[in-house]
């Protein structure tokens, strides 16, 4: 079964990478096909539970069953649509997503494509049984059937200012969930955040069923993290007030996901940032199981290089936060 992931477009490399790592974490056999702008085409092998993947994703909007594709012209679209059999159950509507540079009226395309199917099926623009998706990229136009919609509004509801305990500088829940997904952690596996802060990463990991552990050098922050985890119904967590050099108390873990201190607004207890990173990478490499992943946000290329002395760097995604502030989302393996 071919499916199209409608990526959010928030980040050109993070969005498709999240999809691929999500598929792996849920044990979905797949064959990567291609990416066209914000549309990722994947061939799913066998019977896979794509719904679980949709429930994990943060940087996608929709997952569609692929029906056909055409050259990016209306005449090609309508010609192919007339020749291609499309199974429509009950009523339907057509929705167009234009991610190309062409100035086209989506509603006009929806009417023209919908007109082909309207002879045999009822149109329902508000609550259809089937939604036909028309996806416009620069290279190709895709037609598919909506399979699942990613619940992106949930992440807005979990922003830091809605939590019982928060600090001014906190990662957005969408990015936190994305990083958790990049780690390929599965439900009931152990995930550690050694710089847990208010618990944003642990909340997202706990909500997908991971067993979460975290530490912070400040006791009051560690206690605040516990309060947030309880608020979101996360069970069985373990939060300790310890230095990153003491995280071996957690034993071996399946994934480490963390937002490293930046040295300015973050607490380093006046320790030089390079020394802290060396100790952190050493400790993380000692607790992480073999062939598993560390996913981390790091503020500079120079600090990424420190990690390369301890683990293998497999992916780097520059992520501009605002102004001149750029984080690098990195995936290391042991």
Residue ranges: model-predicted function:
Residues 51-85:
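A broadly used, surface-exposed interaction patch
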Residues 91-98, 102-124, 140:
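Long recognition/docking surfaces used for binding and targeting
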Residues 88-91, 187-188:
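Phosphate-coordination loops involved in phosphoryl transfer and adenosine-cofactor binding
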Residues 22, 77-80, 84, 112, ...:
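Residues that form generic nucleotide/phosphate-binding pockets
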Residues 67-72, 122-124, 128:
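Short glycine-rich, low-complexity/disordered patches
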Residues 3, 65-67, 86, 315-316:
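Hydrophobic transmembrane signal anchors and adjacent membrane-proximal interface regions, especially
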Residues 1-59, 80, 99-100, 104, ...:
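Class I S-adenosyl-L-methionine-dependent methyltransferase catalytic core
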Residues 83-87, 123-125, 135:
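Short, charge-rich binding segments
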């Amino acid at each position: 079964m071919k499916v199209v992931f409608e990526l959010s477009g928030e980040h050109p490399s993070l969005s498709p990478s999240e999809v691929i790592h999500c598929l792996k974490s849920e044990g979905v056999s797949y064959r990567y096909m291609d990416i066209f702008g914000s549309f990722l085409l994947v061939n799913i092998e066998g019977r896979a539970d794509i719904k679980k993947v949709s429930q994990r994703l943060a940087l996608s909007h929709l997952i569609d069953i692929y029906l056909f594709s055409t050259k990016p012209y209306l005449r090609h679209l309508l010609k192919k649509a007339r020749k291609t059999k499309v199974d429509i159950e009950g009523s339907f509507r057509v929705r167009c997503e234009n991610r190309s540079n062409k100035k086209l009226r989506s509603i006009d395309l929806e009417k023209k494509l919908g007109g082909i199917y309207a002879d045999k099926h009822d149109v329902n623009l508000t609550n259809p049984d089937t939604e036909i998706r028309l996806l416009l990229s620069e290279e190709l136009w895709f037609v598919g059937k909506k399979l699942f919609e990613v619940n992106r509004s949930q992440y807005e509801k979990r922003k830091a200012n809605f939590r019982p305990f928060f600090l001014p500088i906190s990662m957005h829940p969408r990015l936190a969930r994305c990083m958790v997904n990049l780690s390929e952690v599965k439900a009931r596996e152990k995930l550690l955040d050694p710089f847990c802060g208010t618990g944003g990463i642990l909340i997202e990991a706990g909500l997908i069923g991971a067993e979460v552990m975290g530490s912070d050098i400040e006791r009051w922050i560690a206690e605040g993290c516990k309060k947030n985890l309880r608020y979101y119904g996360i069970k069985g967590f373990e939060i300790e007030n310890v230095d990153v050099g003491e995280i071996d108390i957690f034993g071996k873990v399946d994934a480490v996901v963390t937002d490293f201190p930046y040295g300015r607004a973050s607490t380093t207890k006046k320790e030089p940032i390079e020394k802290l990173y060396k100790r952190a990478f050493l400790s993380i490499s000692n607790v992480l199981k073999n062939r598993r992943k560390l996913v981390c946000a790091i503020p500079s290329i120079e600090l990424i290089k420190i990690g390369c002395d301890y683990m293998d760097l497999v992916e780097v995604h520059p992520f501009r936060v605002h102004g001149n502030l750029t984080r690098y989302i990195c995936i290391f393996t042991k």
